Amino acid sequence: MKTKELTQSKIEEVSLEILLRHAVKAKHGLEKESMRVNPDGTLSGTTHPIHLGSSLTNHYIKTDFAEPQLEYATHPRPKVEANIRELQDLHIFTIRKLENELIWPFSMPPVLPEEENEIPLGQYGTSHSGRWKTIYRHGLGLRYGRRMQTISGVHYNFSFSKVFLRQFLGKEISNFTKEEISSLYLHVIRNFLRRVHFLTYLTGSSPVFDFTFLPNPGSLKFEKHKNFTLYSTYATSLRMSEIGYTSKVQDTLGIHYNSLEEYVDRMCYAVHTPYPKYVSFSENKDAQLNPNYLQIENEFYSPIRPKQVPKGDERPLDALLQRGIEYIEIRSLDIDPYSPVGVCRSNLAFTQLILLDSLLKVSPSISEEENFSLKENLNSVIWEGRNPELKINVNGSKRNFQEAGAEYSESLRHYAKILDLHTGRRTYQEAIDFQIKKWKNPDKTPSGKLLSEILKRNIEFREKGIELAQENKRMFSYLEYSPGTLMKMEKETIRSFQEKEELEKQEIQTQYPTVKLCNH
């Protein structure tokens, strides 16, 4: 049975058994971006530390937009606790190689240079893939501003196990089609978008920032605290707001998740169609990869994305068209400043419950009207999530947000009990208890806790960042690695440079690979 044909009765028929036997066998992966900073909280001006390996080819530690913006990646694992432990090992390894530098603990950036062009782009060497990465980042800076690109976050990658899919779809693994699997993941994505505003309230940690990030706020109204701190009183995740990872240009593209064909078609249009304003940027050589709405697929901003691992120089869209959706990438998580590694088990367990609920409830196509309503909900929560008077759209009417959120969170307890019964622990029920406290008291959300502490202690955002970064450095300095980690990381450092050198010896290509299967 294809997921688009799933009825509520069918879902209810299989859900208990699936949850009991197979839901905990999912695969998880984490990616986390973090800025390297000087002891005074200013952005590091040094190149990527040689002891961390090549930022182009290291499997675990790369760089994101900026040269000092570390990007960690863990292996896909069946237990998310193992991902968190691996992320901890990567932080331990990094801290012991950084000498005097710190790892910034927030999504919103540290003290930035006065001139935007002084924010250094990631540098990846002379190979064609390395040069393309830097050119792509130069294009991002022109389109959205380098300051915006210094915002960091956590990505949570999730896929259902094959055994789970076999039970859910009612057929043998060998009989799965890529269309069925893709339809199932799109089913989840649509329902996740219907619930993401709840997660943003519970995990958003960016209501406040240093004024060097936004020297000229324009018409946006922020409160000023002391000399260098700006904040929005009820905000949850400014990272996800119009000053963060959103784009009015991208909003015009009409990219939705009602079918893989529709999604790929609109993405193909975006990566092949020039946008007039961006055309002018291409007057300078190597200013951007191309003048299209999106230079490449990864430029598209969304709280969640369907993914398939590309092979070699294969473009992500070709990978999706050839092999369908393999996993989903949740991109709506701020760095948790109260977790040394930037993410906590309870929030990930709760996110997993949302994903299961998204699968186990019917998921009709999202109309333009509903899409507008969902975006309105998310934007309201981003800016006013901790306002006790906030109302959101629920089934065509307005409801108090905190009441609706508490009710939704409690509705997941049935799943949590079954999962905990299977694992022999209370991980999922404790995750719900953890979130319920935030619904009862907005000051217990990470955004509320952070802002309250900065205001009550009368300190700057940058001071709090330095304080947390120093605490984390001390902790990572004495923590022990998992067995075999140090040798693994040292070997990967050497291997990554060898691969980088091999790439630089190859014949230089002059054009970024095109999407072969698009009709545009």
Swiss-Prot record:
Q: Which UniProt keywords apply?
A: ATP-binding, Glutathione biosynthesis, Ligase, Nucleotide-binding
Look up the record and name the pathway of this protein.
Answer: Sulfur metabolism; glutathione biosynthesis; glutathione from L-cysteine and L-glutamate: step 1/2
GO MF annotations in UniProt? ATP binding; glutamate-cysteine ligase activity; metal ion binding
Source species, domain of life: Bacteria
Question: What are the BP-aspect GO terms?
Answer: glutathione biosynthetic process
**What EC number(s) is this enzyme filed under?**
6.3.2.2
- Catalytic function, reaction form: L-cysteine + L-glutamate + ATP = gamma-L-glutamyl-L-cysteine + ADP + phosphate + H(+)
Which top EC class applies here?
ligase
Stored Pfam families: Glu_cys_ligase (PF04262)
**Entry keyword annotation includes Translocase:** no
Gene Ontology cellular component annotations, sorted alphabetically: cytosol
Asked whether the keyword Lipid biosynthesis is assigned, the reply is: no
Recorded family membership? Belongs to the glutamate--cysteine ligase type 1 family. Type 1 subfamily.
Name by which UniProt lists this protein:
Glutamate--cysteine ligase
- The protein's organism comes out as Leptospira interrogans serogroup Icterohaemorrhagiae serovar Lai (strain 56601)
